């Protein structure tokens, strides 16, 4: 059976159980062909800025010796995560905007969901690790080099990734152990957990509980680490006599708190609530925001208010300007 819409045809394949499901159809935001072209252009520009901003920040940290410390190593890992996070979802979504074929293969859907959950969860843990790093640097700066040596921050980063992989494995196995009946249409732009559960004909109570308690536990743990770390940072700031020192700390920590608040706020809205409150159309917009828009915003949030990053960027621009000027004269 087919669904005819302006500009393209979407195939709907009736399925009886999970073994018959060889593909899914991602219905996306709209059937309007003109609007899809506009959405393609919008998200293409966002994705381009995301890659330039995040990968540029990674190269900046690698290339500038002044940024060779744990704080900026964590920031470069966050930027790499954001680039990967967006890349898992955006290219396929862009293709769907301009293609008649909106399908994604069953293995492709499994892979997309696994990577999406892996990078998303890893980012939650990494934001908590970054808060702890700021706490150590500000509350006990004399011991910072010892307490955040490579033997500490490298295992921390590995632990963040390990936690992300474990969490993704749980949900991927649980979700794709279900049967998918009647329709293979996913009312979403990518293979997220709630819309997949919505088209399953199996009992999804265990999956709903897993989603609520796993995501809820991760959110509680990581947010508590952030809150405790910043409570100690606040005490340290109140003891400071230097106004310049306070401004520098507020500049560094304010950007991190902004990023944490936006990211965790959208995740809590998406996953930590009763399944009866899910509205797939609204959730599609919110999930698009935190998978595509937030990765674009993070380089801006973390660089515009950071003096060291701005100086490193200024140094590169000045060097490139000088090189171009010399080349022009020659």
From Swiss-Prot:
GO CC field = membrane; plasma membrane
How does this chain sit within the bilayer? Multi-pass membrane protein
In this UniProt entry, which residues form the Extracellular topological domain(s)?
1-37, 88-111, 167-208, 271-283
Q: Which residues cross the membrane?
A: 38-58, 67-87, 112-132, 146-166, 209-229, 250-270, 284-304
Coiled coil ranges: none
Record's keyword terms, sorted: Cell membrane, Disulfide bond, G-protein coupled receptor, Glycoprotein, Membrane, Olfaction, Receptor, Sensory transduction, Transducer, Transmembrane, Transmembrane helix
Topological domains (Cytoplasmic): residue ranges?
Answer: 59-66, 133-145, 230-249, 305-330
Annotated glycosylation sites: 17
What are this entry's molecular-function GO terms?
Answer: G protein-coupled receptor activity; olfactory receptor activity
Location within or outside the cell: Cell membrane
UniProt keyword Membrane, yes or no: yes
* One GO process term, biological-process aspect: G protein-coupled receptor signaling pathway
Determine the domain of life of the protein's source. Eukaryota
* A Pfam family recorded for this sequence: 7tm_4
PROSITE patterns in the record: G_PROTEIN_RECEP_F1_1, G_PROTEIN_RECEP_F1_2
List the disulfide bonds in this chain: 109-201
Q: Which family does it belong to?
A: Belongs to the G-protein coupled receptor 1 family.
Biological function: Potential odorant receptor.
Put simply, this protein is called Olfactory receptor 5T9
What gene is this protein translated from? Or5t9
């Amino acid at each position: 059976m087919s669904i005819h819409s302006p500009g393209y045809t979407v195939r709907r394949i009736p399925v009886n159980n999970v073994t018959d499901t060889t593909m899914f159809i991602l219905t996306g935001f709209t059937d309007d062909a003109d609007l899809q072209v506009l959405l393609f252009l919008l998200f293409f520009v966002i994705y381009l800025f995301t890659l330039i901003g995040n990968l540029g920040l990674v190269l900046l940290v690698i290339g500038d010796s002044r940024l060779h410390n744990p704080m900026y190593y964590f920031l470069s890992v966050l930027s790499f995560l954001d680039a990967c996070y967006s890349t898992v979802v955006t290219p396929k979504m862009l293709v769907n905007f301009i293609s008649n074929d909106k399908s994604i293969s069953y293995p492709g859907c499994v892979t997309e969901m696994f990577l999406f959950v892996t990078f998303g969860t890893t980012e939650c843990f990494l934001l908590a690790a970054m808060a702890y790093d700021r706490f150590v640097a500000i509350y006990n700066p004399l011991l910072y080099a010892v307490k955040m040596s490579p033997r500490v921050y490298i295992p921390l980063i590995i632990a963040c990734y390990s936690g992300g992989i474990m969490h993704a494995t749980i949900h991927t196995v649980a979700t794709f152990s279900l049967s998918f009946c009647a329709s293979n249409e996913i009312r979403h732009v990518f293979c997220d957990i709630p819309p997949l559960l919505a088209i399953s004909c199996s009992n999804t109570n265990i999956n709903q509980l897993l989603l609520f308690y796993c995501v809820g536990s991760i959110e509680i743990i990581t947010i508590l680490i952030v809150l405790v770390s910043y409570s100690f940072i606040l005490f340290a700031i109140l003891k400071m006599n230097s106004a310049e020192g306070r401004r520098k700390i507020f500049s560094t920590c304010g950007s991190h708190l902004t990023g944490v608040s936006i990211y965790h706020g959208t995740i809590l809205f998406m996953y930590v609530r009763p399944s009866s409150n899910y509205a797939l159309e609204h959730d599609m917009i919110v999930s698009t925001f935190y998978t595509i828009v937030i990765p674009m915003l993070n380089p801006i949030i973390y660089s515009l208010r950071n003096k060291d990053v701005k100086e490193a960027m200024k140094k590169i621009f000045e060097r490139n300007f000088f090189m171009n000027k010399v080349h022009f004269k020659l």
